[in-house]
Structure formats: C-alpha cells, structure tokens
Amino acid sequence: MKESSPINEERLFQEFIKLAEIASPSCRERQIADYLKKRLTELGLAVEEDDTAAKIGGNTGNLLARLPGQEGLEPLFFACHMDTVAPAEGVKVSFKEGV
C-alpha cells in the first residue's frame, strides 16, 4: 500500500507536462520565463528578472524568486535552468506504463 504524501502527484504530473512542452531553446526562453513568472507570482513569491539577456544576446534574463522564510529556520536555495536541449520546440510529452 502506498503511503500518504502531502504532494499532489497529479498536479505535479500536469505541471511537469506543461513545463516540458513549452519551447525554451537557449537564449530564447521568453515563453517559459513568462509562464514561470506568472505561476510563481500566483504562489506568492516575489519575482524579478535581471538584465542578463542584454549581456548575452538572449531574450530572457535570469529569474529571481523569493518567498519569505520563517524566523529560526534555515533558508533554502534552489537553482535551475529554463533552457532545454534540442529538440527544444514542438515537444509532446508521452507516457507509457507510468513512465
């Protein structure tokens, strides 16, 4: 029997599909950046974008998202990429036998 989890697996699954299907080739991550800014803001994070795009000839800077912590607890830091490797456009996620 599967243990109960505070994670909504179906919501996580659907969010993964949305993210994986958004075109995001290197230096052209605008579409996924806009989606992430919207979602993170909806979740209560303060989101800003730096000026890296102008420095590297891209269309998107780095996103910095902050969520206030709680007094006495250690802070967490996450870092990730928005760009994807080829093929970065026209991707359709498919699952077979749960994978």
Residue ranges of predicted features:
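Metal-dependent amide/peptide-bond hydrolase catalytic core
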Residues: M1-K2, E42, A86
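Flexible, active-site-adjacent loop/turn segments at secondary-structure boundaries
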Residues: I17-A20, A54, D83, V91
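Short amphipathic alpha-helical segments, especially helix-boundary/capping motifs
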Residues: E9-Q14, L40-T41, K92-G98
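A non-catalytic alpha/beta surface segment that caps or lines the substrate-entry region
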Residues: P25-G72
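Generic hydrophobic, helix-prone segments enriched in Leu/Val/Ile
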Residues: F16-L19, K38, V47, V93
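Intrinsically disordered, low-complexity segments enriched in polar/charged residues with Gly/Pro
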Residues: S5-P6, D50-T52, F78-H81
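N-terminal capping segment at the start of a domain
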Residues: K2-R30
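Active-site metal-coordination/substrate-binding segment of hydrolases
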Residues: A33, N59, R66, G72-V99
